[in-house]
């Protein structure tokens, strides 16, 4: 049976891709045929090969199972706006079935484990009726929560955690990502979250100047996920 994890964040730009990429590298190092799935992206660049999203490319490259880009990122839009608005402007629709069909194709391609990266935060609209979290619930995927370390992260983390649990989904673990070189009372914030979040703490991502180029293997404890 193929195992999948959904990576969400407490906000936009808190390090979901960094964590998803690091997880893929760790799983690959353990000999697993792992794949990345970034089903929805906006802010894509035009290339000779079509629209490309840097986050999706990084997941594609980190995975041990080679897959074509269109399988990794089926819903790709150029404007850097909310994906459902970008889809509407492109006369497209992001559907629950389309998201599931994409995941099934990756499973059928031979993946043993799939790291699925969300877009935005937990409650990302797909249209005026559905949220990306509806799909995660439909797939009954365990969730990995990325906490961006900044002022307000305690509230953001607790709200996101509560929302995930209210969807009756398990939180497989959580990661804190240092967004800045210095944060007042960082350790106290981390200690508070470790006391309040009843889920495995997978580790800390340090602040680095070029995070998407950094090799952060060894920073995360994936044993609770295996």
Curated annotation (Swiss-Prot):
Cofactor annotation: Mg(2+)
Reading the lineage from the top rank, the first entry is Bacteria
Q: What is its main location?
A: cytoplasm
Q: Provide the reaction this enzyme catalyses.
A: (7R,8S)-7,8-diammoniononanoate + CO2 + ATP = (4R,5S)-dethiobiotin + ADP + phosphate + 3 H(+)
**Ligand binding (Mg(2+)):** 17, 55, 117
What pathway does the annotation place this protein in? Cofactor biosynthesis; biotin biosynthesis; biotin from 7,8-diaminononanoate: step 1/2
Its GO biological process annotations read:
biotin biosynthetic process
Membership in a protein family: Belongs to the dethiobiotin synthetase family.
Protein name (Swiss-Prot/TrEMBL):
ATP-dependent dethiobiotin synthetase BioD
Source organism per UniProt:
Aeromonas hydrophila subsp. hydrophila (strain ATCC 7966 / DSM 30187 / BCRC 13018 / CCUG 14551 / JCM 1027 / KCTC 2358 / NCIMB 9240 / NCTC 8049)
Per the record, the gene is bioD
């Amino acid at each position: 049976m193929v195992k999948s994890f959904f990576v969400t964040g407490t906000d936009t730009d808190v390090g979901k891709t960094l964590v998803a990429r690091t997880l893929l590298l760790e799983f690959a190092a353990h000999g697993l045929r792992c794949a990345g799935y970034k089903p929805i992206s906006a802010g894509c660049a035009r290339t000779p090969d079509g629209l490309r999203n840097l986050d999706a490319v990084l997941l594609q490259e980190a995975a041990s199972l080679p897959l074509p880009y269109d399988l990794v990122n089926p819903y790709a839009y150029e404007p850097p706006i909310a994906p459902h608005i970008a889809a509407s402007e492109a006369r497209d629709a992001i559907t629950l079935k389309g998201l599931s069909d994409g995941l099934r194709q990756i499973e059928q391609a031979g993946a043993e484990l799939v790291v699925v990266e969300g877009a935005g935060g937990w409650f990302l609209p797909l249209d005026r009726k559905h949220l990306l979290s509806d799909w995660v619930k439909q797939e009954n995927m365990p969730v990995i929560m990325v906490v961006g370390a900044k002022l307000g992260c305690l509230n953001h983390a607790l709200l996101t955690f509560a929302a995930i649990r209210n969807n009756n989904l398990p939180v497989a673990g959580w990661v804190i990502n240092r967004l800045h070189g210095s944060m007042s009372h960082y350790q106290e914030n981390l200690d508070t979250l470790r006391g309040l979040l009843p889920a495995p703490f997978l580790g800390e991502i340090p602040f680095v100047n070029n995070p998407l180029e950094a090799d952060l293997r060894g920073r995360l404890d994936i044993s609770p996920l295996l």
